[in-house]
Amino acid sequence: MLVNETFFINSCDDEELDIKRTSNLEYRLSFDDEKEIKALVFITLGTGSNTNISFIDFDREYLAKNFPVAVVSVFYHCFCVRPNPTEERYSAKVNYENQDVINTFKTFKDFHFNPANSNPYEINRHLIDFNAYLSKLKQKSIMDKEARAVVSAIFYPPNDEYQNYGIMSAIDHINALKDLCKRYPKFKTLPKLWGGGSYGGYLALFIAKIAPWYVDAALDNSGSALPVLDYIIGRDLNKPEAYIKQWDNLWFNMFVKTKWNAKDENSPYFFSKEHYKIRSLLVSTHLELQAKKNEEQILISYHSKHDEFGTAKDKEILFNAYKELGLDATLHLIKDEKEIDKRYIKNLKHSLGMSDRALFRKELPALLERFEGKKFRLKKDSISYICGNLTYTFKDKGDKFKLDFTEV
């Protein structure tokens, strides 16, 4: 019989920015209690997964029904970064910060549009009127019918969350693992597999970096080996994270709420090269430490040579480094249409058209066979990475996994 459970736990605070977290972590579990469970599988969800929670549940339940595994979905810190049209509790809200208001009124001026007033709290009303104004310009052939005016806005995740990028998300996964093994002690001796696509793929490999003793296999589909700055300090770089076509005539450049900034070096929220370095997967000294902590990690990645985000070369460098350090690392670099099988790999674009479900469906049988008969245990450990004048120590402390963050 299929067992589905949902748990809420305390996880971690933002140690880098010294911010106390106010929300609990939610994670969901599925397994068939009539099967002998042979592995723990964590689907590391990617950006935008929150738009349809039923898809997440379907994928998790599918794997639990079709394989002898317990499957977990973790709704990590700042997981809800896009609007969810049916479930408000998992939906980011569109908002307008001061810079968005400035940008919008500048666009009004560029198009010679005079809003009813200059009240920034009525920006939605102004935009509706502006859209109608642009429709009239198109009707008079003053404006090209396919053209759109560009404005900006920001996604506010629920629960007062914000984009931390990588660290809190990864720690949440490990705390979910530790909590799960307290509830189900029999799971402690199972191999632990992590995997997902895009940001979810990055998270799987990042978890292998900050807690290698908890990763027996990490599966990645098209994750970036380097932090994506658009997601962290995109506002300051004028690089939106997402784009939305709204109504007939507007194009929204979208950012996600964050505490980080790239302009004020004296700010406690300045995103420094040290903060970047810890989130990078390509630091040679860090890779050496990771490999020494767990020489048995299995690392598997799929990546398009033609990925439109230009991340393929970095992934090649990363997997060559893994191999040179003696890790069991396999990169499937998809180079041309002959490698498109239509079952798993459907195109040469970012993420290859391959879902999380397909990624595990493809790799799980061989991994379960490799793990058959081996003994695994849930041990406690720690690892420290030096990044300039900062030291990041990721460690087990009591029943939690946490970050100790200190200046050298």
Roles of regions detected by a PLM:
Residues 1-39, 408:
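A domain-start/cap signature at the N-terminus of enzymes
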Residues 209-273:
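Hydrolase active-site cap/lid region
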Residues 80-84, 224-232, 341:
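A short beta-to-alpha transition loop/helix N-cap that caps and shapes the active-site region
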Residues 196-206:
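Glycine-rich nucleophile elbow surrounding the catalytic serine of serine-hydrolase chemistry
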Residues 26-135:
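Short, surface-exposed "cap/lid" segments of acyl-processing enzymes
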Residues 186-198:
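Alpha/beta-hydrolase fold nucleophile elbow
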Residues 34-35, 244-408:
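Serine-hydrolase catalytic core
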Residues 93-184:
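Alpha/beta-hydrolase active-site loop
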